[in-house]
Amino acid sequence: MHRYSYYKTAACTLNVSIGDPQANKEEILKCIQELDSDTQLVVFPELCITGYTCQDLFYEHTLLNSAKQVLFEIVEELPENLVTVIGLPLEIENKLYNCAAICFNHDILGIQVKTYIPSYNEFYETRWFSSASELKENTTFTYKNKKVPVSNHIVFKDTTTSACLGIEICEDLWVTIPVSSTHALAGANVLCNLSASNEIISKANYRRNLVKDQSAKCYAGYVYASAGPTESSSDLVFSGHNLICENGAILNETKTDKIIYGQIDLDHLNHDRLHYKTSMQDLFHVNYTTVEFTSKPIEEIEFDRYIDAYPFVPNNQDERIVRCLEILHIQAQGLATRLSKIHCKDVVIGISGGLDSTLALLVCHEAFKINNYDSKGIHAITMPGFGTTKRTKSNAQILMDLLHVSSEEISIVDGVNQHFKDIHHDPEVHNITYENSQARERTQILMDLSNAYNAIVVGTGDLSELALGWCTYNGDHMSMYAVNASVPKTLVRYIEIGRASCRERV
């Protein structure tokens, strides 16, 4: 796991017993025993040691003392090398706080305190809890004669992996500037939320988008663990909606299991943070405490993360068509603007019958419609060579006829054979010289025709080819305007299909 930068996280929902910390301790430990052995972080729901719906029982010192004692007992029984985040109420200097204890290797690393205490609609937490903003500076909590920091401005940095954890509690996410945002600015790349989010109509979808979008804004992983249906249903219902997201993508979401896992790619997140520097500019200048801990590297991993072979292609057909048409419009608008700026009404494009040149021709056609140009100004040139098949040649001609563009066929065979004689190359030797000579001959034809027509050459190469260097230097890598340069190969076909689908619907 360390070697591949993946950090395995889990979110758990408990069968909670209201006001019974001992019973909840057994449930927490049972869940931990069920975790996969390579799990590095587990997050439990808000106030899970007591239950979220204790209401005025939170005033009882018997419950509060029992909750604190149970926390100590859980810490002693935790397995090695597992960061465990547990919710409980804590009385500190005659005030009650909604807290999360961050535990590791039989120790409490710190106490994160809830900042935003809701008191609206179905929530009335201010009846019992104080905000972290009421904490005195440098407040601590004693465990084993050690002073543990208590704050809402703490991050927990693993010196072995590149994981840096930031914790927030339920409502802290739902406000204008979430606590996790300042955590991210302080370096946290794995954000955890202990929640007790109830169910009302459409709230699940809003919550899903909230967690997903926050992970994107913070360039972070986000582990969201919520209270489940065994909380009191006197006036609220909880479903245990757990989510694990990464940089705007949902890695896992509760279906039926009470435990979900997500492998967060820390290297990817850290790379994005280096790249998008403006998002990491801290304008708040909040003083943070960084608590360091050292985990053991996990060498054996069972990789179960889904990797999409077509990351740029939406699975939903309607969404895919909308995206592809949007891309086509962006391409066409770019070319249309360039043609308008240089006062040019003619383009030259090489057509092979393949995907890339087909898309480029469609882009030219759309651009000419935007500028209200005559499509005959699109000079589509087919240049058959030694390897041209009847099928690709036929496809190219059909497309050009359908679009009513100017078409012309120029064979490169004689020109390339003469070139082989000039450079003393045997045409029976099919090496790189044989291949590149044909590509350069085609480019020469296109460039010369662009001069003849007072036009520009439109390039057809796509992003994948450019990234891999899959083009001929001084050949098809050259053009005046390359419309496919930002389109990956896996998306090209779908843009063409999307345009065709749209035409059929109209």
Protein language model annotation of sequence segments:
Residues M1-G350, E366-S375:
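Enzyme catalytic cores with a strong preference for nitrogen-chemistry domains
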Residues A23, Q69, P178, Y206-L210, ...:
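Generic recognition of stable, solvent-exposed alpha-helical segments in well-folded globular domains
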Residues L47, A196-S197, A227, M383-F386, ...:
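Short, ordered loop/turn segments at secondary-structure junctions
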Residues K114-I117, F123-S151, T160-S162, L173-T176, ...:
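Active-site adenylate/phosphate-handling loop in enzymes that bind or generate adenylated species
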Residues C192, V347-I351, L355-A396:
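ATP-dependent adenylation/pyrophosphate-handling site
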Residues K217-C218, R338-K345, E366-I378, T388, ...:
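Secondary-structure transition/capping motifs at alpha-helix termini
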Residues Y261, E292-Y310, Y373, G377-N431, ...:
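A conserved beta-strand->alpha-helix junction
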Residues K345-S357, V413-V416, D462-S464:
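A glycine-rich phosphate-binding loop feature that marks nucleotide/adenosyl-phosphate handling sites
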